[in-house]
């Protein structure tokens, strides 16, 4: 596959919390779409090993959701650290998108970018500085055409790959209902 500057990199992280100064990344997944939002590649879905003290420091919400999904067990069993996750992810991305070409795509990607900047700087640097944030479209639709919101329901699994797939489907939905371009 030849890398294409028009392809889009979609990313989702699962973290132990919302504060990059104290919380850590525990899962990463990436997908690549063409400019028409067709999925053309799935990157590795990586649970990132964290010590038990990091996992024990998670709040109740994170303990519950990441426990029920099996992510905590996958993190404990994982042999991958953050540097290995970065290397594997970039090796995948290089097949589809040149460095610096794609905005960071997903839902609430500003939060993901904060964690990448702190713990996976090389991966954060792979993206263009711009974001394609589906949550921005959602906020606009909620205010300007709230009736459209009822046509798309998210599952909110808080599993990185499923969350990205849902973000792409959500943008496809908004594209069909809102954008006439």
Swiss-Prot record:
Q: What is its EC number?
A: 3.1.15.-
Instruction: Tell me the enzyme class.
Output: hydrolase
- Could you tell me the keywords of this UniProt record? Cytoplasm, Exonuclease, Hydrolase, Nuclease
The superkingdom listed in its UniProt entry is Bacteria
Say where the protein is mainly found. Answer: cytoplasm
Q: Does the keyword Transmembrane helix apply?
A: no
Q: Where is the Exonuclease domain?
A: 8-171
Molecular-function GO term, any one: nucleic acid binding
Q: Which family does it belong to?
A: Belongs to the oligoribonuclease family.
**Official protein name in the record:** Oligoribonuclease
Q: Which organism is it from?
A: Shewanella sp. (strain W3-18-1)
Q: What is the lineage of its organism?
A: Bacteria, Pseudomonadati, Pseudomonadota, Gammaproteobacteria, Alteromonadales
């Amino acid at each position: 596959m030849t890398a294409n500057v028009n392809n889009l990199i979609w990313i989702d992280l699962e973290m132990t919390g919302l504060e990059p100064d104290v919380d850590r990344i525990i899962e990463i997944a990436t997908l690549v779409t063409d400019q028409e939002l067709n999925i053309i590649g799935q990157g590795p879905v990586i649970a990132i090993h964290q010590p038990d003290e990091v996992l024990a420091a998670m709040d109740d919400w994170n303990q519950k959701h990441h426990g029920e999904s099996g992510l905590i067990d996958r993190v404990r069993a994982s042999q991958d650290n953050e540097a290995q996750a970065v290397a594997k992810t970039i090796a995948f991305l290089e097949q589809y998108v040149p460095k610096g070409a794609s905005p960071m795509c997903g839902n609430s990607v500003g939060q993901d970018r904060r964690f990448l900047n702190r713990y996976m700087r090389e991966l954060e640097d792979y993206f263009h500085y711009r974001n394609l944030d589906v949550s921005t479209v959602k906020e606009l639709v909620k205010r300007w055409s709230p009736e459209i919101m009822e046509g798309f329901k998210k599952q909110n699994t808080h599993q990185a790959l499923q969350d990205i797939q849902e973000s792409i489907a959500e943008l496809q939905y908004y594209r069909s209902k809102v954008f006439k371009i």
